[in-house]
Amino acid sequence: MTQTAAQQPSPRLVSGHGLATTAADGAVLDVWFPAPVAGPLSAADASLRDTLRALAADDADRGTTQAVVELEVDLDAAPASTADAWLRLHALSHRLARPNELNLDGVFGLLTNVVWTNHGPCAVADFELTRARLRARGAVQVYGVDKFPRMTDYVVPSGVRIGDADRVRLGAHLAEGTTVMHEGFVNFNAGTLGNSMVEGRISAGVVVGDGSDVGGGASIMGTLSGGGTQRIVVGEHVLLGANSGVGISVGDDCVVEAGLYVTAGTRVSVLQDGEAAHTVKAVDLSGVPNLLFRRNSTTGGVEALPRAGRTVELNAALHAN
């Protein structure tokens, strides 16, 4: 009797036609994918390839060349090239994949550190000579020196407002109805899943649920440095008060008082009927809904109070983008 092998799941594919900019030393500075799709390359718009070929141009002042690339990647496999990494970042910002739902292992090693200018991406090596050549065209503005560009230079998602484009990296996932104010920040592989007000920092790996407000100066711990591995989720209808911070996931309909930073090891007194019932580490309350986290103004201790039946409501007029 023969046994039928277990059917392997179909790969999750993203594909697209892109325009790659390459420096004189062969380093890929950027790859723009204007219309990536979820699925195989055959599903992508073939006419876009000809449009991009017409746009491809060499730039002697920057020492760059451009060429069309065609790429199909398995989101569950690790990125295999610089163009592959760029396609994944575009997939996030085009909402083809949500944060933490695609493999980004090794992405930093694949991306090139680039001088981002108003004349396009430039190599870091000998940039002052490049700047001198570009000055013949007019003023040279350097937006940054980094591996990740501004999202809006490559993707402008529908239904969002962004007060300062410098504050949102390519690879950010902004859902319809998201407003990022001038002091808000959204890293790559992070973002919102619904209507949200962002006036604080959403670090890499963090997702914020529908109807939530990240208050001015608020901070949500990420996973890029310090050895952290916990993925933090901010639930739906959550308010993180101004200058607050969290190092744990926050459940639906929770409020963190302004100025209070709750790390995983913070000792929290859980109150019932106004009395302390027991004390736990904050990580034990990770993801628990309907809580108010506050600092007792007399003792300075951190407390968690139940707030069942109450929710956070955003101003709908501010999110009709």
UniProtKB/Swiss-Prot annotation:
A biological process term (GO) from this entry: lysine biosynthetic process via diaminopimelate
Alphabetically ordered keywords of this record: Acyltransferase, Amino-acid biosynthesis, Cytoplasm, Diaminopimelate biosynthesis, Lysine biosynthesis, Magnesium, Metal-binding, Transferase
Residue numbers annotated as active site: 199
Residue ranges of coiled coil: none
EC number(s) from the headed UniProt entry: 2.3.1.117
Pathway terms, separated by semicolons: Amino-acid biosynthesis; L-lysine biosynthesis via DAP pathway; LL-2,6-diaminopimelate from (S)-tetrahydrodipicolinate (succinylase route): step 1/3
Chain sites annotated for binding succinyl-CoA: 201, 216, 219, 242, 257-258, 265, 281, 294-297
Catalytic activities: (S)-2,3,4,5-tetrahydrodipicolinate + succinyl-CoA + H2O = (S)-2-succinylamino-6-oxoheptanedioate + CoA
Subcellular localization, as worded in the UniProt entry: Cytoplasm
GO cellular component, one term: cytoplasm
GO terms of molecular function: 2,3,4,5-tetrahydropyridine-2,6-dicarboxylate N-succinyltransferase activity; magnesium ion binding
Residues the record lists as binding Mg(2+) 2: 183
Enzyme class: transferase
Residues reported in the UniProt entry to bind Mg(2+) 1: 166
Function recorded in the entry: Catalyzes the conversion of the cyclic tetrahydrodipicolinate (THDP) into the acyclic N-succinyl-L-2-amino-6-oxopimelate using succinyl-CoA.
Family, as annotated: Belongs to the type 2 tetrahydrodipicolinate N-succinyltransferase family.
Assembly and interaction partners: Homotrimer.
Protein's name according to its UniProt entry: 2,3,4,5-tetrahydropyridine-2,6-dicarboxylate N-succinyltransferase
